Amino acid sequence: ENDLVVRAAHLLKRHTAYPFGASIALKKNIPMGAGLGGGSSDAASVLIGLNRLWDLNLSQSELMNLGLELGADVPFFLFGQTAFVQGIGEHLEVIELPEDQFLVIFPGKSIATKDIFQAETLTRNHAPITISHFLASHWSDPQFGNDLQPVASMICPEVNRALDWISQQLPNSAKRMSGSGSCVFVAVPKVLGTNEIDHILQKLPSGWVGRLVRGLKQNPAYNSV
């Protein structure tokens, strides 16, 4: 009952007073506690899918408002486009970013998001960032660092291990932790071919998982919302 998929289905059913139910099968490919928004994207997918299956015809904004009740990241996945997000996830603005390739590493350990935000060492004094300022720079600029990374590294030392491992494989690369961790990522230089990337992934320590992914400007399910 606490799974976001189940909560999303129940929330939509209550909100619309829909009389029937649905059978939902979930196959998770994104590790839990990885900082990749796997649970939030699952919840968004359920809202999108059941909205169509049940012929509810709720608008994107209605679904996003419902999604916010499930978590701050859910509206982003319902928004379906590359976005600059503010507030508690309710203010989103489309931005244009290159569809770069990224190497994402899961260091075999999960981190509970609540542990990060409950940590006494978490600082909340980062200078505000505007959209124009962000777009005028590159995401790898140090001023756009992940404020959760130092805390996550103390809770889960594997985060720093993964960042150090990336530095060994791709020196001078701009690497970061994703979300609240524990995954880390790095933009893959365009000069690297598939064979070279495969060679890097073969060096992963036991228990780690690595994937080559590509940034998207739009969610494949965007037109379903």
Residue ranges and their predicted role:
Residues 1-20, 211-221:
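N-terminal beta-alpha supersecondary unit
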Residues 22-35, 174-175, 210:
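Short pre-catalytic strand/loop immediately N-terminal to key active-site residues, enriched for Gly-Thr
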Residues 79, 84-174, 187-202, 206, ...:
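Conserved, helical-rich catalytic subdomain that frames metal- and/or nucleotide-binding sites
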Residues 38-39, 177-182:
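Glycine-rich beta-strand-to-loop/alpha-helix junction loops that act as flexible
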Residues 14-25, 49-67, 190-203:
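Phosphate-handling active-site elements
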Residues 34-62, 76:
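DPxDG-like acidic metal-binding loop motif
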